[in-house]
Amino acid sequence: MVIEELTLEEKIGQLFMIELDEKGIDDKTIEMIQKYKIGGSILYSKNYQSYEEMVRMINQLKEINQVNKIPLWIAIDQEGGRVNRMPKEVVPLKNAFDIAKTKDIELVKKSGQVMGKMLKETGINMNFAPVLDIKRFKDIHAIGNRCYGENVQEVETYGIEVMKQIQKQGIVSVIKHFPGHGRTKKDSHFFLPTIRTRQEELEETDVHPFQRAIQEGADAIMVGHIKVKKMDEKYPASLSEKIVGQKLRTDWNYKGLVVTDDIKML
């Protein structure tokens, strides 16, 4: 099945990914999948109480989607550390920064392999990880220890390796938060962070890991709800034609999937 074979309504549906109700799959979920042909669903730990319940829910979503032409994206935020959406039976990985600061590339690879395998075994096919932002502040904040390093080289070496290991398990790895969330302490879940750094400097630092990841085969990229004034004076990155249309699609010739961060945050 190729996109050209879909109806207009089906193409529109593919643009959306929904969050399940806290109680799980309900009539509204079924309607969104079967009537509106949505592209996928993201799971949170609030949606299940056990590993068995999680797997059962994933299988139900796939069964509900059988009437559609394209498989459902079943996604999760599984970074390790404080961003852990797996049930309590699954031992969580350490956070990205602690793993990367060992400078043990084999350990980094192993963390990506384990992450990918645990998701594959559940039936999940998309992971919103790794974070390719650069850690710039010592204290814990919105991004902090979710990063793989404090400079471009560390983030590219360790973050992109994790991306590759997730991919090797057949999971789509969504790198985030383009064009870089590391220069602000503000949490984009609650505020619209504004970055005023010169574009030339951003291109050499925060933006660079994303370009490198694309060159090395990134499947998908998440665009953050971040206002980068020197790249687009008016719109946040997630709504910016200059950042998505011009930078990603035209300048970098990126053909992969582009996803926004959660629209509820806007």
Q: PLM ranges: what are they?
A:
Residues 53-63, 105-121:
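Active-site-adjacent structural elements in enzyme catalytic domains
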Residues 7, 19, 25, 47-66, ...:
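Second-shell residues forming the walls of enzyme active-site clefts
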Residues 21-35, 107-118, 203-210:
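Short, acidic/polar
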